A protein has these predicted regions:
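Extracellular structured ligand-interaction cores
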Residues: 3, 51-53, 97-99
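Glycine/small-residue-rich interface belts in oligomeric ring/scaffold proteins
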Residues: 18-81
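Short, structured patches in soluble enzyme cores that scaffold and shape functional sites
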Residues: 8-10, 58, 104-106
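Primarily extracytoplasmic ectodomains and periplasmic/lumenal surface modules that are beta-strand-rich
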Residues: 13-15, 45-49, 109-111
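Short secondary-structure boundary micro-motifs
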Residues: 11, 40, 85-87
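N-terminal, Lys/Arg- and Ser/Thr-rich interaction peptides
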Residues: 1-20
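Internal, well-folded beta-alpha domain core
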Residues: 61-223
Length: 223
């Protein structure tokens, strides 16, 4: 199967938990809904799940906290207004030196990654990412192999990670309305700062033709 391999890098990443107000905590890995958002930013329109399958690996050098300014609001005279005490200060958890290897099965999107309509971000708008490489590759289906930090459908034996509930996508077509949540699934998230590749067996594993090792595989998500 032909696919695109897109490599993105950044200074920081902070993927917020998409279903709850999470304070400073971030999601272990970007949700597949987040990856659709990154692709949509490059394309310049909403990219829907039926248009492409997605595989990915996300790595970083570590996790840290920083302090940032916040714009506070207060309810006064029946309206939301700027807080009388001015700006606030809060902590923000983030990943450092993030790198994303994105595998997209819709090769017609290549020009969008080469000339993106908007700046892709690793979470918030200050987490600016840049694309360093876009290439056409071949994904060969295999039954087993060594996999790195990604989201695998739960349960998946043979890996160390966290179990997380994340949406596949959101519907956000009606202006002024809250977005609608698509299917919510449980995944096993392999921590992004681990350097161990786990040997697993499952369906929907593929060996990228540009992988550094013959046993390396990626999971390509089925919506």
């Amino acid at each position: 199967m032909k696919a695109l391999h897109v490599h993105l890098e950044g200074y920081t990443a902070s993927f917020r938990r998409p279903l709850i107000i999470s304070g400073i905590k971030i999601t272990t890995l970007p949700a597949y809904s987040t990856l659709l958002g990154i692709i949509s930013a490059c394309v310049g329109r909403t990219v829907r799940p039926h248009e492409t399958r997605i595989g990915f690996e996300f790595t970083c050098s570590g996790v840290a906290e920083e302090i940032e300014r916040t714009h506070r609001l207060q309810f006064e005279d029946g309206r939301l207004r700027a807080h009388s005490k001015g700006l606030g200060i809060s902590k923000r958890q983030m990943y450092t030196d993030p790198q994303l290897d994105l595998y997209v099965t819709n090769c017609s999107l290549k020009s969008a990654f080469e000339h993106p309509c908007a700046t892709p971000c690793f979470g918030q708008s200050q987490d600016v990412a840049w694309i360093t490489n876009v290439g056409e590759i071949e994904l060969t289906p295999v039954s087993e192999g060594a996999i790195g930090p990604t989201l695998l459908p739960y349960p998946q034996g043979g890996v160390a990670g966290l179990i997380v509930s994340l949406p596949d996508w959101f519907e956000n077509e009606v202006r002024g309305r809250t977005r609608l949540v698509g299917p919510i699934r449980k995944f096993e998230a392999i921590l992004p700062f681990t350097r161990t590749r786990y040997h697993i067996r499952r369906a929907d594993l593929f060996h990228p033709s540009d992988a550094p090792r013959d046993e390396d595989v990626v999971y390509v998500h089925v919506w």
